[in-house]
Amino acid sequence: MKKLLFSTFLLVLGSTSAAHANLGYVNLKRCLEESDLGKKETEELEAMKQQFVKNAEKIEEELTSIYNKLQDEDYMESLSDSASEELRKKFEDLSGEYNAYQSQYYQSINQSNVKRIQKLIQEVKIAAESVRSKEKLEAILNEEAVLAIAPGTDKTTEIIAILNESFKKQN
């Protein structure tokens, strides 16, 4: 991806007839943090995280309760062998369920985060193209691909404004 961006950048620089190319850049992180779309996507991700955490806490409480019973010698001695074995089995099963739940949590959060970023990048591309054509720029690059550029070429604020306008129309 970075090689492709760099190659595209070199191609744009090489294809301009003048020594000075008219370029801009966008800060994707700012778009994610400051745009209404980015804020909404972040809120949804946080809500998803909170739901997972709440459910995990319930399982943790139950695991702790069973663990404490298993560690209490007096309690364990008062149980029949079958009840004692059943409690151990319940602890093992619940531990496995908890581990599977945590794995599902991380996988779901990662997938949601990737989708969130992909969605934002698609919207930023549309907004960047609008700014590029309006301001007659050769290209708008991702800030991470730019090592040095003249002051005043940051188009992030303009792109965030377009993202917010588009978000308001859609909602």
UniProtKB/Swiss-Prot annotation:
Signal peptide: 1-21
GO MF assignments: unfolded protein binding
Keywords noted in UniProt: Signal
Biological source species: Chlamydia pneumoniae
Keyword Flavoprotein: no
Swiss-Prot/TrEMBL GO biological process terms: chaperone-mediated protein folding; protein stabilization
PANTHER family, alphabetized: CHAPERONE PROTEIN SKP (PTHR35089:SF1)
Family the entry assigns: Belongs to the Skp family.
GO cellular component term, pick one: cytosol
Gene3D superfamilies: Skp domain
Domain of life the protein comes from: Bacteria
Protein's name according to its UniProt entry: Skp-like protein
InterPro entries per the UniProt record, alphabetical: Chaperone_Skp, Skp_dom_sf
Keyword match Signal: yes
